[in-house]
Regions:
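Short, conserved phosphate/pyrophosphate- and ester-handling motifs at nucleotide-, phospho-/glycolipid
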Residues: 17, 159
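GST superfamily/GST-like fold recognition
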Residues: 160-164
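Short glycine/proline- and acidic residue-enriched helix-loop micro-motifs
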Residues: 112-133, 222, 227
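Active-site catalytic microenvironments for nucleophilic, acid-base chemistry
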Residues: 50, 73-77, 144, 148, ...
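General small-molecule cofactor/ligand-binding pocket signal
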Residues: 13, 84-86, 200
Length: 227
């Protein structure tokens, strides 16, 4: 793999999509193509307004409409002509859990759901995909986006579980519970440099001030390296 100098670092604003009715009901959305609700549409505009202060030159999105709508709002605010669908950013395939609450999943198979909650490296959603596979494709997607946009700043819109899995891969066990609070409409900033993904900011709700949006730098975070 060819290396790039620091000037070719790509900064990725990884945005969680806005709220949907299923988010409000705390149900697994998975691959269901549910629309943003009124709150989610407002969050999309908030994200677009906040990121309008950043020199974003490209916008990527999960193919699901709730993410694309946020990506479109960001692209319009930045004058970016196209939102690029990226299959690696799509949500976890929850299989039989899709549409259920956590309580319903736990009641159906307590051991399997305990693994999901406590040991994502081993968890596999029944009839769906493993969290390890979801994590691998998310990291691959972010690295691919970073390589394609060396020296630039971009936005990518994905889903709560996918953002959490990316943070877990970079930070490791130091984050504790991998299902940490991640509000809809929030952003987490990553960078890709020399084929590595690093975490720049903690999780923050988007704000117009770029210094506030960047948050506190995590300079010594472990990194996921492209294979």
């Amino acid at each position: 793999m060819s290396s790039v100098d620091r000037g070719n670092t790509c900064r990725i604003h990884l945005v969680r999509h806005g709220r949907t009715v299923m988010n409000a009901q705390v149900r697994f959305r998975g691959r269901r193509d549910v629309a943003l609700d009124e709150v989610g549409r407002a969050e999309a505009l908030e994200a677009a307004n906040a990121l309008s202060t950043h020199p974003i030159t490209a916008v990527y999105s999960s193919p699901l409409q709730r993410a694309r709508d946020v990506g479109t709002a960001i692209a319009n605010a930045r004058g970016v002509s196209e939102v690029h669908d990226h299959p690696g950013l799509i949500n976890v395939d929850y299989g039989e859990w899709e549409g259920l609450t956590k309580e319903e999943c736990a009641a159906h198979d307590p051991e399997l759901f305990r693994a999901y909650a406590e040991d994502p490296d081993r968890a596999h959603c029944p009839g769906g995909e493993s969290l390890a596979d979801a994590s691998n494709r998310m990291i691959a997607a972010l690295l691919e986006i970073g390589r394609a946009n060396a020296g630039r700043e971009v936005a990518a819109v994905s889903h709560g579980a996918m953002v959490r899995l990316a943070v877990l891969r970079v930070m490791g066990p130091s984050i504790g519970d991998w299902q940490f609070k991640l509000p809809t409409g929030s952003a987490t900033i990553f960078e890709v440099k020399d084929g590595e993904l690093s975490l720049v900011s903690p999780i923050n709700r988007l704000q117009p001030d770029p210094h506030k949006a960047a948050g506190t730098t995590v300079e010594d975070a472990p990194r996921a390296v492209a294979s």
